[in-house]
Amino acid sequence: MGKDTGFLEIQREQPTRRKVEDRLQDWFEIYEPFPEEKQREQGARCMDCGVPFCHTGCPVNNLIPDWNDLAYNGRWEAAIRRLHATNNFPEFTGRICPAPCEAACVLGIDQPPVSIKLIERSVVERAWEEGWIHPEPPEQNTGKRVAVVGSGPAGLAAAQQLRRAGHSVTVYEKNDRIGGLMRYGIPNFKLEKHVIDRRLEQMRAEGVTFVTNAHVGVNVPVEALTDHYDAILLAGGAEQPRDLKIPGRELKGIHYAMEFLPQQNRRCEGDKDEDFLSDPSLAILAEGKRVVIIGGGDTGADCLGTTHRQKPLSVHQFEIMPTPPAQRAASTPWPMWPLQLRTEGAHEEGGIRDWSINSLRFTGDENGNVKQLHMVRVGPPPSFEPIPGSEFTLDVDLVLLAMGFLGPVRSGMIEQLGLALDNRGNVATKDGYMTSVEGIFAAGDMRRGQSLVVWAISEGRKAAAAIDSYLTANADVEPQFRRALV
């Protein structure tokens, strides 16, 4: 590495978050700029560790030591080339990936790990600023047509890879804007949407076609795809939310996280014609309300940060699992993803966070509005036995359910295509990402279940390679004119 003793001399640093009182007044990303000199210093902490275990934690197999060293030496343009060799969208992972690579960093065995996520974001943002990221259209078209259903990170990664390989690619998105969960599920304070838009401009210039308001299996018949395309990739995500089936669930004021978060993202986009904007009874807002968020994961934290910015009266976040340890648990030794307490920016902003809480029932008023949540403290998993005498009640006006996702929505497209499902309810695939129907492939959360943005990109790239092999197995295409898919 460029500085053999960097990990001994330089401490881990991260960008500071903007002051809570400032960032709660807007929807912009929460981190302050990080000076270039410090970015390079963080790259110097990457050790000459022999076997870089950071690779084992990275689903896209990023060449992490390579671009850490290039960043340290100020070779930013070379760094973005190495970064793009494995990751189509480092600006997404550099913002919303939890960085399992850092959990697997060798330095992290007994010191704070290398700031890999920070360096990744620094490299790609420098590349955008300098104009080093540009369209890469194919030199030759294959004449093959591919439909991609879903425009989240898996669908976008596959679409870009397939187009660069010379195939004609059309992406179908049920919403009115491209981006999937990144567009409508991730709050702006974590991912401002211009970050998505600039990458879409590159993809359009490469020749990818996007069709919005196209819900395949609902307002677009599946035959429109099966009759027209040589291959179809399903990348519609795992959108079926886990419900809380307790008495009182039918009361007004109880909503899934993915009903709440998209509304605010649409407000941030400046939408004017949504039903919830013209009819206040359809709006899900936390302003002046006593809010409870059920679920302690990333989606719950997104609901928490969004709630804070809407000025609630109070907010509680409850999780049925016990409080994680402050440091890596013995049950998840290095280089595994550690079980440990994580504090997001949203938690820093306020609210009460509590663990080992099970919800028993909701009660409401005479108008059918939720007014109370009855809970009990429980013991450890797997039994979660209620602790006698620990029952308590909380007054509430708004409840947000953020308890994860059960898999893809089966009705509509999946049922109409007659696709087989696995034992978890996800779309089943054989070797090479092909489903039970010839020529139809699946990738991302639709195939593997609820997961991370970095896994989605990995799935999209691998599915693209499988589709490319399927389409060109017997095709007369000169290989020297085609971009290899890896």
Language-model regions, residue ranges each:
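Beta1-alpha1 glycine-rich phosphate/pyrophosphate-binding loop at the start
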Residues: 5-32, 61-73, 78-83, 87, ...
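A short, basic/flexible loop-to-alpha-helix module at the beginning of a structural domain
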Residues: 30-31, 35, 127-146, 265-289
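Local cysteine-cluster metal-coordination motifs and their immediate loop/turn environment
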Residues: 44-66, 89-110
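Feature captures the FAD/FMN-dependent oxidoreductase FAD-binding
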Residues: 140-141, 145-149, 197-246, 360-375, ...
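Phosphate-coordination loops involved in phosphoryl transfer and adenosine-cofactor binding
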Residues: 142-145, 213, 287-290, 356, ...
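Conserved hydrophobic helix-helix packing surfaces used for dimerization/oligomerization
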Residues: 146-148, 169, 291, 440
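FAD-site-proximal beta/loop scaffold in flavoenzymes
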Residues: 250-288, 381-450
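A conserved FAD-binding loop/helix module that cradles the flavin
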Residues: 300-305, 443-471
